[in-house]
Amino acid sequence: MRECISIHVGQAGVQIGNACWELYCLEHGIQPDGQMPSDKTIGGGDDSFNTFFSETGAGKHVPRAVFVDLEPTVIDEVRTGTYRQLFHPEQLITGKEDAANNYARGHYTIGKEIIDLVLDRIRKLADQCTGLQGFLVFHSFGGGTGSGFTSLLMERLSVDYGKKSKLEFSIYPAPQVSTAVVEPYNSILTTHTTLEHSDCAFMVDNEAIYDICRRNLDIERPTYTNLNRLISQIVSSITASLRFDGALNVDLTEFQTNLVPYPRIHFPLATYAPVISAEKAYHEQLSVAEITNACFEPANQMVKCDPRHGKYMACCLLYRGDVVPKDVNAAIATIKTKRSIQFVDWCPTGFKVGINYQPPTVVPGGDLAKVQRAVCMLSNTTAIAEAWARLDHKFDLMYAKRAFVHWYVGEGMEEGEFSEAREDMAALEKDYEEVGVDSVEGEGEEEGEEY
């Protein structure tokens, strides 16, 4: 069995976790108490959803997940919410005092008190697996727990489970909507620490999701519930191939193989289509060609950046629902001729395709329409460097005046870590720049460099 363990860190991670597990349960027909009427093999079995759920002898399905937060309020909502019976109480781990938006608290002072407990719980989950495939880590860049504790956890997971892949779903701080002044600090510190430990990181930018909710779903003032339900659809599309049997299934390691050309350049851009409200869906036929084309619209991306300014290094299309390979090939052929999609010259224009016959499910009473087919595109493009540049610029503005730095130093960090992290980010921007440069011109000087 190829199991995956999901780890939800901090408020953002936990709330996205709630949305994701709610959706998974609906997709698999699992009730909030963990019973699954459709499941014929009690207490085990080798169904594909067992990658995400373990089964007890009583026929209860328990998510292979850990929820961690350094303060109790958010996870208390899970403990009292609709799905309280779904999770094992030990899977919900809370501390006493929060990280106060401070990376240093999440990583050093408060985080280190709880890390061993968390790893212990993860070990228990891992021991139940026959062939653990890897970890999915959900967190935000801006929060103290999401940035600091996640980077600590990733370092420790690399030590304990060296060869297992670690994928991140990271909430990138929105350019306009900010929940904390120090988000740029936390984001850059966590990216620097996690860069060498993460195999692939899907970034989601709150502002991009806000815009999609406003524009496509006509929600004037989107709440976090709206955002998380949309994010959970994307996560579900990416993980569908692990949870269902499909025609062209995609494994966790397969994502990395196809999307990550160099270890550091592992930030694919996710795009999902169709995002459409019920009243509109009734009047539109959403063919494979249409939804595939929608994926190349910058408006449907999960991070604000413009792929038309960048070059694609790899592209992966994950379809679900009523889709046949013939339609997909036709759609891709059309896009290759019509769209001005620039690939880097060292990469042939390959599109990796996954098809899953399970149609998308929507949360009843939610904003999204039930559609026959959907697609999630994961593309590795040099344009995402724009997002890093934005963040680095904000970091520089504050750090030039050393604003707020004393809070971090007071928690046992050294100022050198800031400059070290910033240099690493500058190197990352440079890496993206070099990857996009055509290889023919720079042949002479490139020879000496090792990759």
Swiss-Prot record:
Main location: cytoplasm
Modified residues (Omega-N-methylarginine): R339
Molecular function terms from GO: double-stranded RNA binding; GTP binding; GTPase activity; structural constituent of cytoskeleton; structural molecule activity; ubiquitin protein ligase binding
Mutagenesis or variant effect for E254D: Promotes microtubule nucleation efficiency and slows GTP hydrolysis
Binding site for Mg(2+): E71
Catalysed reactions listed for this entry: GTP + H2O = GDP + phosphate + H(+)
The organism's place on the tree of life at top rank: Eukaryota
Modified residues (5-glutamyl polyglutamate): E443, E445
Family statement drawn from the similarity comment of this UniProt entry: Belongs to the tubulin family.
Domain comment quoted from the record: The MREC motif mediates interaction with TTC5/STRAP and may be critical for tubulin autoregulation.
Assembly and binders: Heterodimer of alpha- and beta-tubulin. A typical microtubule is a hollow water-filled tube with an outer diameter of 25 nm and an inner diameter of 15 nM. Alpha-beta heterodimers associate head-to-tail to form protofilaments running lengthwise along the microtubule wall with the beta-tubulin subunit facing the microtubule plus end conferring a structural polarity. Microtubules usually have 13 protofilaments but different protofilament numbers can be found in some organisms and specialized cells.
Protein name: Tubulin alpha-1B chain
Species for this entry: Homo sapiens
Organismal lineage: Eukaryota, Metazoa, Chordata, Craniata, Vertebrata
Originating gene: TUBA1B
